[in-house]
């Protein structure tokens, strides 16, 4: 006990961690808050599960058009608990989207987007777009028939945009047609660009909530 107390005192002297703890644990919670105000937190938990299970799958997944499908099959059939890791990843992805939708409805119906919380709402909308992008890019990674044709259709949508449409299609596909470059780009987006982007906007979102507090009743 003496040693643990000494360690605590050492950190307290340098970082004043007690003040941080008091700020976190003593934040005022309005009496109107109910279980529906937990939907955003549940979405965060789903993202953390996604991050953990996705990280685990990167040890076995091979982002090539010739090995992607076989590596996923290997994960599902030969790796210990691989089927469970991938299944949890898929289930938590669906749960994350559902919780996000419900969270958006709750915020909108209770007026949580109004002044002075406009920027909090904007960061939330950006995170919703990133979440959809997660779904689109992740759907293609097994590179089966469903994934391939989903990528071909989705990456071809920007072609309808005047002037820059063809450029955006080529940018997404990494060339004129869907192939290895497309899979590499979608894999990079799904495992690096989107997670870090979402983490940054989550941090901004939470800091604004901490600063402004929970919105009042409608």
Curated annotation (Swiss-Prot):
CDD domains cross-referenced by the UniProt entry: Cytochrome_b_N
Coarse class of the protein's main subcellular location: membrane
Protein residues bound to heme b 2: 89, 190
Top-rank taxon: Bacteria
Positions annotated to bind heme c: 38
Keyword hit for Thylakoid: yes
Entry-linked PROSITE patterns: CYTB_NTER
Molecular functions (GO terms): electron transporter, transferring electrons within cytochrome b6/f complex of photosystem II activity; metal ion binding; oxidoreductase activity
Localisation per UniProt entry: Cellular thylakoid membrane
Cofactor note as given: Binds 2 heme b groups non-covalently with two histidine residues as axial ligands.
Binding of heme b 1, residues: 103, 205
Keyword Nucleotide-binding among record annotations: no
Subunit description: The 4 large subunits of the cytochrome b6-f complex are cytochrome b6, subunit IV (17 kDa polypeptide, PetD), cytochrome f and the Rieske protein, while the 4 small subunits are PetG, PetL, PetM and PetN. The complex functions as a dimer.
Protein family membership: Belongs to the cytochrome b family. PetB subfamily.
UniProt cross-references to PANTHER family, sorted A to Z: CYTOCHROME B
Name of the protein this chain belongs to: Cytochrome b6
Organism: Prochlorococcus marinus (strain MIT 9215)
